[in-house]
């Protein structure tokens, strides 16, 4: 049974502006610790951040809370399996919170073009 769905669109140029204005502080706010090593290797960091931002926003919409404790950027990491399929990795606090709501699985799709990054999330209970 579907618990919730969420989607988000982000303009990488907007992210580039935030990076110019706030620098590394902005990236650290968006990324979980486990995403940092991949981020620093990016040739287009604004696209990398736009996709993560969109994915995390879409998750917050799917759970119906928006970004508020414990649904926070730092508690959510986007990872990829061996085939390249994206999935979420959650901090323990968020794992517990998700479990209390009966959410048993999630599905994440991320896409990007030159001027747009998008994410779609489905949560099941």
Swiss-Prot record:
Catalytic activity: apo-[ACP] + CoA = holo-[ACP] + adenosine 3',5'-bisphosphate + H(+)
A single BP term in Gene Ontology: fatty acid biosynthetic process
Signal peptide: none
SUPFAM superfamilies: 4'-phosphopantetheinyl transferase
Compartments where located: Cytoplasm
Domain of life: Bacteria
Documented EC number(s): 2.7.8.7
Cofactor dependence: Mg(2+)
GO cellular component labels: cytoplasm
Residues that coordinate or bind Mg(2+): 8, 57
Gene Ontology terms, MF aspect: holo-[acyl-carrier-protein] synthase activity; magnesium ion binding
Swiss-Prot/TrEMBL keywords: Cytoplasm, Fatty acid biosynthesis, Fatty acid metabolism, Lipid biosynthesis, Lipid metabolism, Magnesium, Metal-binding, Transferase
Top-level EC class as recorded in UniProt: transferase
Pfam families: ACPS
Family to which this protein belongs: Belongs to the P-Pant transferase superfamily. AcpS family.
Function: Transfers the 4'-phosphopantetheine moiety from coenzyme A to a Ser of acyl-carrier-protein.
Protein name: Holo-[acyl-carrier-protein] synthase
Organism: Nitrosomonas eutropha (strain DSM 101675 / C91 / Nm57)
Gene, per the UniProt record: acpS
């Amino acid at each position: 049974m579907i618990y919730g769905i969420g989607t988000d669109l982000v303009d990488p140029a907007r992210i580039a502006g935030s990076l110019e204005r706030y620098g590394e502080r902005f990236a650290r706010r968006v990324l979980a610790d486990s995403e940092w090593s991949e981020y620093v290797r990016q040739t287009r960091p604004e696209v990398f951040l736009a996709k993560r931002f969109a994915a995390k926003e879409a998750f917050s919409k799917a759970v119906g809370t928006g970004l508020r404790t414990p649904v926070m950027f730092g508690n959510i990491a986007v990872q990829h399996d061996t085939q390249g399929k994206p999935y979420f990795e959650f901090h323990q606090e968020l794992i517990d919170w998700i479990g209390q709501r009966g959410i048993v699985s999630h599905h994440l799709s991320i896409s990007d073009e030159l001027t747009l990054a998008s994410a779609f999330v489905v949560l099941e209970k």
